[in-house]
Amino acid sequence: MRVVLASNNAKKLVELQRLFAALPIELVTQGSLGIAEAEEPHHTFVENALAKARHAAAEAGCAAIADDSGLCVDALGGAPGVVSAHYATVVLPAADREAQRAVQDAANNALLLDRLQGQADRRASFVSTLVALRHADDPQPLIAFGRWQGEILDAPRGEAGFGYDPLMFIPALGRSVAQMPAEEKSRCSHRALAARDMLALMRAHWLA
């Protein structure tokens, strides 16, 4: 069964492929099929994930899954939230997508640290919402949620991962997300929690 991932993020594809390895599905990015990214005009993760999944399913003519995720910082009223990926406004280099993403990630992290200067409350959560559709007009989307709680560091730690991983410290594990091996992140992350729920939903409703 082919399922289109409504994202062109190569690192997210690798992470989700690892998480969904137990299912008899072929997960491919929409970019590999020539599908442009959908608009994300909504104020909640679930609405944006649904919009992205519906767009990918309509363009590909098959099942689709979308992840809308982000960082929600308590002291900032939940920001950056749904705009986590583009929190900072930057001029991106005319280079490949991964190089652009690295520049954007660095700018986002710098802005977050600036907004939290002098703030004692560093509590935050990584939030992931996964939405899967059998087709674009599927009236019964599968929806799964994951939340990973931690604290924002004063400076980046670690070289692995992407996005805000170097700033997100997990007290229970004693290190930042960017200091974790990929296997550990795949077990513990917000996306892993959502994926486990989605695996159960797919088995029960799509693959039974």
Curated annotation (Swiss-Prot):
Its EC number is 3.6.1.66. The active site is at 68 (proton acceptor). Its cofactor is Mg(2+). Keywords: Hydrolase, Magnesium, Metal-binding, Nucleotide metabolism, Nucleotide-binding. Coiled coil: none annotated. Disulfide bonds: none annotated. One of its GO terms (molecular function) is dITP diphosphatase activity. It catalyses: XTP + H2O = XMP + diphosphate + H(+); dITP + H2O = dIMP + diphosphate + H(+); ITP + H2O = IMP + diphosphate + H(+). GO terms for cellular component: cytosol. One of its GO terms (biological process) is nucleotide metabolic process. Mg(2+) binds at residues 39, 68. InterPro entries: dITP/XTP_pyrophosphatase, ITPase-like_fam, RdgB/HAM1. Binds 1 Mg(2+) ion per subunit. It holds the Pfam family Ham1p_like. CDD domains: HAM1. Substrate binds at residues 7-12, 69, 162-165, 185, 190-191. It comes from the Bacteria. Belongs to the HAM1 NTPase family. Pyrophosphatase that catalyzes the hydrolysis of nucleoside triphosphates to their monophosphate derivatives, with a high preference for the non-canonical purine nucleotides XTP (xanthosine triphosphate), dITP (deoxyinosine triphosphate) and ITP. Seems to function as a house-cleaning enzyme that removes non-canonical purine nucleotides from the nucleotide pool, thus preventing their incorporation into DNA/RNA and avoiding chromosomal lesions. Homodimer. HAMAP family: Non_canon_purine_NTPase (MF_01405). PANTHER family: INOSINE TRIPHOSPHATE PYROPHOSPHATASE, INOSINE TRIPHOSPHATE PYROPHOSPHATASE/HAM1 PROTEIN. This is dITP/XTP pyrophosphatase.
